Curated annotation (Swiss-Prot):
It is found in: Cell membrane; Endoplasmic reticulum membrane. It comes from Mus musculus. SUPFAM superfamilies: Calcium ATPase, transduction domain A (SSF81653), Calcium ATPase, transmembrane domain M (SSF81665), HAD-like (SSF56784), Metal cation-transporting ATPase, ATP-binding domain N (SSF81660). The gene is Atp8b2. Mg(2+) binds at residues 411, 413, 833, 837. This is Phospholipid-transporting ATPase ID. The chain crosses the membrane at residues 69-89, 92-112, 296-316, 339-359, 899-919, 923-943, 973-993, 1012-1032, 1037-1057, 1083-1103. GO terms for cellular component: endoplasmic reticulum membrane; plasma membrane. Residues 1-68, 113-295, 360-898, 944-972, 1033-1036, 1104-1209 are cytoplasmic. Component of a P4-ATPase flippase complex which consists of a catalytic alpha subunit ATP8B2 and an accessory beta subunit TMEM30A or TMEM30B. It is a multi-pass membrane protein.
Length: 1209
């Protein structure tokens, strides 16, 4: 092959440095990919990655060292390894090494088994994929090769229904013109077929011998993750040919409806776009995780302080007192320095007191989160029967964060709406079609409409298509030229593929539901798109087959927001047909009659007001000479290696101008079931919902009213449409001024200051009286998100009850979410269903994917997924609230029980000469956290609930404590620590005081170290068991079994450890022989245990009774209400048993209940629950919740500190 002179010098070199291997060195990156067909020796110079994929992390040799290295990246594991090393030093260790190594090994083993299991399945999947077979052309012969042995530059033969082994350049196929059909479900989840086409120069290479002689070279972009873009050039026979994404078959696709095709491997293995897109999602941590890390550091500091205090005590005691005992006690070799003695004592006490930060905490947290995730996955009420799709928790680390959400960012299409498009109305030459009027000229409602239009004249019509305005069909039959041209455009300007399984049975495969709806409408009105080839489109126009020559497709993208086709009709006339967004197309029209533009614009506004999705249609005639010249420049732009897309966009911009307006379409996208009720319920839970959509303003606003985000009761809906920074700033400031002036008028006493600094914006949130909404367009949002305006935008938006951002790009969606995350101390959730929502989903604290019509990219990027928006209320108000409640109660109890356990050693230090002697038996220390107290707290953390799920939905105000971090924060932590320290004081000093004077039954002294240890340990286990019984709000059989079972296990192990049998076998290890039997046989000991338990528990019980009586929280009020209802129902049942009456009053009561049921079904009672609740919540938490919300806002910096206007319940 000869390289043309036009190739840049860097491409004309014979070779390139081997810096593009699978493991690319840090000093080199691949700037371009060169692949020559049938020349492995040449391609091996570049050391490209092989086609072997590896998603596994370990092998048999590396598993143990690598996994241990990864686990010791965790600070907690490293901390406990450090303690283990300390325990191996005899001079400072007062505990056996197994007290730390047993829990540590247990944790490491559990994690390692989990990692090994996950990696085993990755290995299994890798082997399954790598060992698939493909037909590869080697030395002129097709041979069966494993996928892992395929190399860049190889030519592969694919057959129907086979997976594509690597990223291939399509060379030829069994279909005419080098076409082939693929399914991309594994890439983007879309099951509709897509068409790919070989370039004409290679489409005739269908023979193996011809392909064996093919030596073309492809020079293209380096590996990247852009699924919809490819730019390259084929050099062959002294010519160059542009390549695009339409010529590529990507790994993971499946060949469909094509007998065979040949492709040239461009990217292999980890360089394929599928693997480039399988990178790890950013790891998300919850606010509780971050708080817990801070608290653990504080605890460690507290541990060091205790160690220092006891070390100083040891140094003083050794110097002042210790020498007196050396005369008659066995003593280690005297330490020369009291300071050194204190130093050794410090490390000894660090070892003993380390249980304030138990290693089992981290394992327990993960187990609880895993249980919560399974509850979400198993929830039948979040299972969609129609799609057979369950809810899925795709992560286990964010469950409790679901109970703290304050902002929801939602896509509209496919998320709030069904994304099932229906052709509803249209405007043609200034005439609107779609509405039906009665004899009096009034618009008929849906239930009053006549029969739909009869399309029986058209044997190819889609029987599922419904349209109500028969005048449009009459215009078609009458031969109206504008109407014919309108539907001709819809039948030609698209990328839909048709499939005809039987004669007359057409099936359309559209890349978007909008296109499918438009082509189906044209089909029913007599303009039937029948088939296409790369160069032609065949349409049956009112029964006559007409084939148009397809000259060019100017494809749609998010920037252009339009698509066009250029066709030549049988008479040789060239015409451009274009459809796109009104904001784009109306600026590119030939000045028509003012009347046509005005009427079409009015229709567009009317359609948008009805919540319909609109497109404008236009056309333009091209003369042959202009088209030839334009096509030549388009070819040059498509061959450009630099800025190819920008050059093509400029060429497209030129031809898509001075067009003639033809009309507009309006497509209906209905709301999903339950959306208004869900939004109303979440709003009552003080969750703010922002809709971020690409639709036009009128459509978005109408959907806002439909789903009850916007209401007629709102004080004002602000619309920001400025085109410059100054205009946007002025509109935002006017909105804030109106809100504040209104609040001042009702006596809030807030003074507005016109010049707000970006560093100290006056918080409007506390001053706003009334309900406001903000609607902002994409071009205005671009200015509002600039660095010097973002705070003003956020301040205004956060003061509003609802925010709708229209005409926004995927990047702007992510920027809005990032803005709220940056300045607001609030948890954000983003929910969407399409690829354009992925960036928003990944940016938010929590990402939720809807499995809908737009593929599964949003689901793959999400943390949670389900099939309908209405399930969001259950995810947050039930699973999220419960997960937060359970995790908070678990952490409070866990810190309490460990401080109660550990601090006893601290007090004992003052009575044992600061000798680092432990109170408990070393086996009790080892088993306390992993056997005696682990299962009860796990059961509470997994199963506990304060109110039933129905009440969580009925009283959304119950959600607020999570938003305010009321259940676990620094204050609650210190309360738990104080309770733990209080318990430890009583558990040490009560037995100590009793044992000082008590005697046994035989009159001998009761006090000895071993009896004291057994008494304190037994008291501890009983106290913490009673405490968790008080903390448990929802008792199950599992809770009973774990709590009482743990107590039974404790006594069983205690008596076993102190038995003669174990002492005889291991006399050096089990030295408490017979102690348990002797100690627990004494009535004084049981009285001491009972006294200790009562004194530890009674203050807690008293405090809770007082709080319940004087200051109950909302969940207490709801539980009380439920008890009252149950008693009333029981009384009614008793009354019915006493006697029956025939009074009409019972009939009236029954009919009244029927009416209330209709009210519930209508959704109008959404506020009723809150209002009804307020009747008995004067003693409840509404006031203190709101005061805490105000306190939170006052203590925070503006605007993050601004609290939202509380919703009155």
């Amino acid at each position: 092959m000869t390289v043309p002179k036009e190739i840049p010098e860097k491409w004309a070199r014979a070779g390139a440095p081997p810096s593009w291997s699978q493991k690319k060195p840090s000093w080199g990156t691949e700037e371009e990919r060169r692949a020559r067909a049938n020349d492995r020796e040449y391609n091996e110079k570049f050391q490209y990655a092989s086609n072997c994929i590896k998603t596994s992390k370990y092998n048999i040799v590396t598993f143990l060292p690598v996994n241990l290295f990864e686990q010791f990246q965790e600070v907690a594991n490293t901390y406990f390894l450090f303690l283990l090393i300390l325990q191996l030093i005899p001079q400072i260790s007062s505990l056996s090494w197994f007290t730390t190594i047993v829990p540590l090994v247990l944790v490491l083993t559990i994690t390692a088994v989990k990692d090994a299991t996950d990696d085993y399945f990755r290995h299994k999947s890798d082997n399954q994929v790598n060992n698939r077979h493909s037909q590869v052309l080697i030395n002129g012969v097709l041979q069966q090769e494993q996928w892992m042995n395929v190399c860049v530059g190889d030519i592969i033969k694919l057959e129907n229904n086979q997976f594509v082994a690597a990223d291939l350049l399509l060379l030829s196929s069994s279909e005419p013109h080098g076409l082939c059909y693929i399914e991309t479900a594994e890439l983007d989840g879309e099951t509709n077929m897509k068409v790919r086409q070989a370039i004409p120069v290679t489409s005739e290479l269908g023979d193996v011998s011809q392909l064996a002689r093919f030596d073309g070279e492809v020079i293209c972009e380096p590996p990247n993750n852009k699924l919809d873009k490819f730019s390259g050039t084929l050099y062959w026979k002294e010519n160059k040919f542009p390549l695009s994404n339409q010529n590529m078959l990507l790994r993971g696709c499946v060949l469909r409806n094509t007998e065979w095709c040949f492709g040239l491997v461009i990217f292999a293995g980890p360089d394929t776009k599928l693997m480039q897109n399988s990178g790890r999602t950013k790891f998300k941590r919850t606010s509780i995780d971050r708080l817990m890390n801070t608290l653990v550091l504080w605890i460690f500091g507290f541990l060091v302080c205790m160690g220092v205090i006891l070390a100083i005590g040891n140094a003083i005691w050794e110097h002042e007192v210790g020498t007196r005992f050396q005369v008659y006690l066995p003593w280690d070799e005297a330490v020369d320095s009291a300071f050194f003695s204190g130093f050794l004592s410090f490390w000894s006490y660090i070892i003993i007191l380390n249980t304030v930060v138990p290693i089992s905490l981290y394992v327990s947290v993960e187990v609880i989160r895993l249980g919560h995730s399974y509850f979400i996955n198993w929830d039948k009420k979040m299972f969609c029967m129609k799609k057979r799709t369950p809810a899925e928790a795709r992560t286990t680390t964010l469950n409790e964060e679901l109970g703290q959400v304050e902002y929801i960012f939602s896509d509209k299409t496919g998320t709030l709406t069904q994304n099932i498009m229906v052709f509803n109305k249209c405007s043609i030459n200034g005439h609107s079609y779609g509405d039906v009027f009665d004899v009096l000229g009034h618009k008929a409602e849906l239930g009053e409409r006549p029969e739909p239009v009869d399309f029986s004249f058209n044997p190819l019509a889609d029987k599922k298509f419904l349209f109500w305005d028969s005048s449009l069909l009459e215009a078609v039959k009458m031969g109206d030229p504008h109407t014919h041209e309108f539907f001709r455009l819809l039948s030609l300007c698209h990328t839909v593929m048709s499939e005809e399984k039987n004669e007359g049975e057409l099936y359309y495969k559209a890349q978007s539901p909008d296109e499918g709806a438009l082509v189906t409408a044209a089909r029913n009105f007599g303009f039937v798109f029948r088939s296409r080839t790369p160069k032609t489109i065949t349409v049956h126009e009112l029964g006559t087959a007409i084939t148009y020559q397809l000259l060019a497709i100017l494809d749609f993208n998010n920037i252009r927001k339009r698509m066009s086709v250029i066709v030549r009709n049988p008479e040789g006339k060239i015409r451009l047909y274009c459809k796109g967004a009104d904001t784009i197309l109306l600026d590119r029209l030939h000045p028509p009659t003012q009347e046509l533009l005005s009427s079409t614009t009015d229709h567009l506004n009317e359609y948008a007001g009805d919540g319909l999705r609109t497109l404008v249609l236009a056309y333009k005639d091209l003369d042959e000479e202009y088209y030839e010249e334009w096509a030549r420049r388009r070819l040059q732009a498509s061959l450009a290696q630099d800025s190819r897309e920008d050059r093509l966009a400029s060429i497209y911009e030129e031809v898509e101008s001075d067009m003639m307006l033809l009309g507009a379409t309006a497509i209906e996208d209905k709301l999903q079931q339950g959306v208004p009720e869900t939004i109303a319920l979440l709003t009552l839970a003080n969750i703010k919902i922002w809709v971020l959509t690409g639709d036009k303003q009128e459509t978005a606003v109408n959907i806002g009213y439909s789903c009850k985000m916007l209401t007629d009761d709102m004080t004002e809906v602000f619309v920001v449409t400025g085109h410059t920074v100054l205009e946007v700033r002025e509109e935002l400031r006017k909105a804030r001024k109106k809100m504040v002036d209104s609040s001042h008028a009702v006596g809030n006493g807030f003074t507005y200051q016109g010049n707000l600094s970006s560093s100290k914006l006056t918080s409007v949130l506390e001053a706003v009286a009334g309900e406001y909404a903000l609607v902002i367009n994409g071009h205005s949002l671009a200015h509002a998100l600039e660095a010097d305006m973002e705070l003003e935008f956020l301040e205004t938006a956060c003061a509003c009850k609802a925010v709708i951002c229209c005409r926004v790009t995927p990047l702007q969606k992510a920027q809005v979410v990032e803005l709220v995350k940056k300045y607001k101390k609030a948890v954000t959730l983003a929910i969407g269903d399409g690829a354009n929502d992925v960036s928003m989903i990944k940016t938010a604290h929590i990402g939720v994917g809807i499995s809908g019509q737009e593929g599964i990219q949003a689901v793959l990027a999400s943390d949670y997924s389900f099939s309908q928006f209405k399930f969001l209320q259950r995810l947050l108000l039930v699973h999220g609230r419960w997960s937060y409640l359970r995790m908070c109660k678990f952490l409070c109890y866990f810190f309490y029980k460990n401080f109660a356990f550990t601090m006893v050693h601290f007090w004992f230090g003052f009575f044992c000469g600061f000798s680092a002697q432990t109170v408990y038996d070393q086996y009790f220390i080892t088993l306390y956290n992993i056997v005696y107290t682990s299962l009860p707290v796990l059961a509470m953390g997994v199963f506990d609930q304060d109110v039933p799920e129905q009440r969580s939905m009925e009283y959304p105000k119950l959600y607020e404590p999570g938003q305010l971090n009321l259940l676990f924060n620094k204050r609650e932590f210190f309360i738990c620590i104080a309770q733990g320290i209080y318990t430890s004081v009583l558990m040490f000093f009560i037995p100590y005081g009793v044992f000082a004077e008590a005697t046994r039954d035989d009159g001998t002294q009761l006090a000895d170290y071993q009896s004291f240890a057994v008494t304190v340990a037994t008291s501890l286990v009983i106290v913490v068991s009673v405490q968790i019984g008080l903390d448990t709000g929802y008792w199950t059989a599992i809770n009973h079994f774990f709590i009482w079972g743990s107590l039974a296990v404790y006594f069983a192990i205690l008596f076993a450890m102190h038995s003669n049998g174990l002492f005889d076998m291991f006399p050096n290890q089990f030295r408490f022989v017979g102690n348990a039997q002797n100690t627990l046989a004494q009535p004084t000991v049981w009285l001491t245990i009972a006294l200790t338990t009562a004194v530890c528990i009674m203050p807690v019980v008293a405090f809770r009774f007082l709080r319940l009586s004087l200051k109950p929280d909302l969940s207490d009020t709801v539980r009380y209400t439920q008890l009252v209802r149950k008693k009333q129902k029981a009384q009614h049942r008793c009354m019915r048993r006493v006697g029956r009456t025939g009074s009409r009053r019972s009939g009236y009561a029954f009919s009244h209940q029927e009416g209330f049921g209709e009210l519930i079904m209508s959704g109008k009672n959404m506020r009723l629950s809150s209002l009804a609740l307020s009747s008995f919540s004067t003693r409840s938490s509404s006031s203190w919740i709101e005061s805490l919300r105000r306190k939170k806002s006052d203590s925070a910096n503006s605007p993050s500190g601004g609290a939202e206007k509380p919703l009155k319940g």
